């Protein structure tokens, strides 16, 4: 996927099993992740549906790259 905006380098929907493992490792429930609406341009670009977990890779001036995860919610 090409560069989208605001330093975002990559946006992908992670597979359900990978999302389960991630949540288990982080000791979180899905709703405890930050949310992103399905209507958000980043979510639409990735083809995300409510209930999916997005992996977003951004440029960071201090870390080089920052990886964040978002739960896709309706809207």
Curated annotation (Swiss-Prot):
InterPro entries listed in its UniProt record: Arch_Rpo5/euc_Rpb5 (IPR014381), RNA_pol_subH/Rpb5_C (IPR000783), RPB5-like_sf (IPR035913)
Keyword Metal-binding: no
Single annotated GO MF: DNA-directed RNA polymerase activity
Transmembrane regions: none
Pfam families: RNA_pol_Rpb5_C
Catalytic activity: RNA(n) + a ribonucleoside 5'-triphosphate = RNA(n+1) + diphosphate
GO CC field: cytoplasm; DNA-directed RNA polymerase complex
BP GO annotations: DNA-templated transcription
Main location: cytoplasm
Similarity section: Belongs to the archaeal Rpo5/eukaryotic RPB5 RNA polymerase subunit family.
Function: DNA-dependent RNA polymerase (RNAP) catalyzes the transcription of DNA into RNA using the four ribonucleoside triphosphates as substrates.
Record-given protein name: DNA-directed RNA polymerase subunit Rpo5
Lineage: Archaea, Thermoproteota, Thermoprotei, Thermoproteales, Thermoproteaceae
